[in-house]
From Swiss-Prot:
It comes from Spiroplasma virus 4. The keyword RNA-binding does not apply. GO terms for molecular function: structural molecule activity. Its main location: virion. Belongs to the microviridae F protein family. Assembles to form an icosahedral capsid with a T=1 symmetry. GO terms for cellular component: host cell cytoplasm; T=1 icosahedral viral capsid. This is Capsid protein VP1.
Amino acid sequence: MKKKMSKLNARVHDFSMFKGNHIPRSKIHIPHKTIRAFNVGEIIPIYQTPVYPGEHIKMDLTSLYRPSTFIVPPMDDLIVDTYAFAVPWRIVWKDLEKFFGENSDSWDVKNAPPVPDIVAPSGGWDYGTLADHFGITPKVPGIRVKSLRFRAYAKIINDWFRDQNLSSECALTLDSSNSQGSNGSNQVTDIQLGGKPYIANKYHDYFTSCLPAPQKGAPTTLNVGGMAPVTTKFRDVPNLSGTPLIFRDNKGRTIKTGQLGIGPVDAGFLVAQNTAQAANGERAIPSNLWADLSNATGISISDLRLAITYQHYKEMDARGGTRYVEFTLNHFGVHTADARLQRSEFLGGHSQSLLVQSVPQTSSTVEKMTPQGNLAAFSETMIQNNYLVNKTFTEHSYIIVLAVVRYKHTYQQGIEADWFRGQDKFDMYDPLLANISEQPVKNREIMVQGNSQDNEIFGFQEAWADLRFKPNSVAGVMRSSHPQSLDYWHFADHYAQLPKLSSEWLKEDYKNVDRTLALKASDNTPQLRVDFMFNTIAEKPMPLYSTPGLRRI
């Protein structure tokens, strides 16, 4: 009898449950080829696609990079970085839940806002803009498309590429308002409007990772105590010739003697005498105030320990970053998943140097008198990214794949810090001094000029970092300043004026590469031509074919 009752109870209907639907899925092969041309430093979207809840994506990428022909084989490397990200719609559009019917009131369902639009600028988007790279036909005015992909790109930049110490965030609208597109190159306002691509920052090295200050925030200070009495002392005037008081104007000039009378306000400064005589026995009080610290309260060991901890806290924030994902990692050693922090999610990536092939000349040239064996160069590099993406998605998102080409920088105008070290023994490294605060990097280390600016501070770096880093260098005729310079053999920096630690200086510079190419970006010829081939296997919550029929009315 008990067994029968238990079976009966097991079959009781639960009104709080909804069975839902079993959605069949289909495995679909989606190849995609795209050919692009761009310059060094530009972060280019090379692939974008929407994904839906329950969709699984496995993506491989094969790339063929062909830079412009080099004048000679360069002695530096161009490095390709490829990144794949997922950006949920909800983190770039706050009304997503309302769009799909979520209501904050009772049964009534209010009109849901549509996905926000962006309208092409006057004359349409230009060639080479983000809109162009995302697949929108350029130079067509009046185009009206949905804006979430541009917002997603801006979100990725803010989360992963922006230097938070020097650069402002890209503007990012989250509401349902429509926007007007742009062809501009402003790195703050024009990114979410489909303007020019964001320029990546240089790779981190001794100079590019410098901090604006030793700590993030005001330096922690130690107060001597609460209050101290101020004591005054008198000084006897020795004789009648003493002149303890002299009248001067606001520029330090002695005020003229004369008689003040009725006149205009701008008549000048006048007094009867320019000094005041003292009499015997009188006392003057010039610059006579100081604190008597014998009665001041001192700082306790607990307060000292707390102040040191505050300073450590601020130094950790400066060096490790203060995005929340960075804070939890630096302070607690916990790497929080991107999805938990409403961030764009990094799915995978790859980094590889481009190969350069030398081409020796086999016959002389009459016009330029170049001999046989004269070298030129070209690059044709195949890059294979297996499993660039392999993920199941649980919400509406965009997959966006980005590519950028950069190089490691060589410096030719500075002098290493150790050449100036040795004023005293505390200027030299000692294990006891290993963990002192961030130390200044002087201007002379990146560009020496032989003037007072050499000793000014360029930025701050961890103590003794110059002993752990050796900057790449050139010399002799390889220097860009040489009258017969051969700087087309390398990508070394050469500054016309003293660089400043700033967002503008931190951006990757395509011009160093331009001087090594036969066809230059300055002549409106993109430095790189790339053939991208995406091989995607998608398991989608949809049939393999959509066949219409009366049974599905």
